[in-house]
Amino acid sequence: MSAVIENHHDDHDHGPAKGITRWLYTTNHKDIGTLYLWFSFAMFLIGGAMAMIIRAELFQPGMQIVEPEFYNQMITLHGLIMIFGGVMPAFVGLANWLVPMMIGAPDMALPRMNNLSFWILPFAFFILLSSLFMEGGAPNFGWTFYAPLSTTYAPPSVTFFIFSVHIMGASSIMGAINVVVTIMNMRAPGVTLMKMPLFVWSWLITAYLLIAVMPVLAGAVTMMLMDIHFGTSFFNAAGGGDPVLFQHIFWFFGHPEVYIMILPAFGIVSHIIETFSRKQLFGYSSMVLALLSLAILSFVVWAHHMFTVGLPLAAEIFFMWATMLIAVPTGVKVFNWVATMFRGSLTFETPMLFAVAFVVLFTIGGLSGLMLAIVPADFQYHDTYFVVAHFHYVLVPGAIFSIMAAVYYWIPKWSVNMYDERLGKLHFWLSFIGVNVTFFPQHFIGLAGMPRRYPDYALIFADWNMVSSIGAFLFGFSQLLFLFIVIKTVMGGKKATDQVWEGAKGLEWTVASPAPYHTFSTPPKVD
């Protein structure tokens, strides 16, 4: 009995510390998830401001508001910040908040490493953004940083860019290890692998992808560093190297990377469609199998980014075939989402609107991707605005809509307050219209031959560029409404129930709203 009394002080739930130290020292998965989400939103706004500069320059032909050198810095930083600062930290934040609650774990497996993996990120982006103020300007070679533009002809700030990418990679690897260890070791009794929520499955697979490909990116930028400062010739033909080697290494990282940015979105959308259809998700095991297939296939398609570089014909045929194969598991997922909605009791709250838009617009992005997979056609499409339209249709209504859907869906559980449904729907429709007005016309100007990454263009492309820019400003400014909605919700509002949504299933809906600082200190029993 005495042992129980001695340890009694351990039974109290310790709430968060007061003030700034709560956030600096926190090892709580909910606090770290919140930090990731706010950080990602800040980066989303910075990357978005850069996109606004790009679209303002392209509003009319001719040189308008920025120098060509600065334009190139904008397209480089916009891509890097949106991918490594906007989308990825948002999904890691959602993983931190939700994965432990969904599997009945008290926290992440490695809480101190969790803190470290977040707090090195602001430094990485401070270093990256500080390059704007250096002599020679920021990196200007595009987010894919192809050598020799990023080595022989790079501005001096490239060294800071390399260091920044290393820090981001370290953060991603630590976060991914944490997710894998948590999911493999900390599931509550009864939560078998095939009973895990799909968001948890999608993150388990994503984490393995991160662990596999982040070291490849680190290798690529290290070889760049050696070429720039230490006299090697990895990518310098004059010294026996090969610039195409860089492209192979980069895209071996880069293609799994784009799946890292979409697999968690698949998990989120599966949950939301299931909830608002008020029926069980159609084809759970095939959804898991499709996620696994996509992850495996993502490693054997990288050279479809390089069809015009002079690959052997046999390689072009293989990569075309492998890329088209990607459509099969993706089609399975889209079919299952539609089948889940079929004859369901549908209601269209804001999360569901974003999820349905995701399914429709992601499919459009997938179809244009199938066109790009065809080698002879890609010789025409490559490096035109058709490619820009394709990947933005997958990333904006894909990854970003799913993140917004997730925030609307889970914020009542996080904050106990319901968001303003009318404002949420207004935000959805502004975003939906903005995205389509921005990126749909880019298919047309791309097919007509307008190349990417130029601040000026021929007169024939003027009309659609103006339309695209108007859509971009509509989409960009409507995100300020999203910021307002989130702050308003956190500050107060109609109180949510514990379940929040009729039809919501899963362990996270069994805890109180707002989710207590410590959940599942005793593991729940799952049938």
Predicted feature locations:
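Membrane-embedded and interfacial regions of multi-pass energy-transducing membrane proteins
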Residues: S2-D527
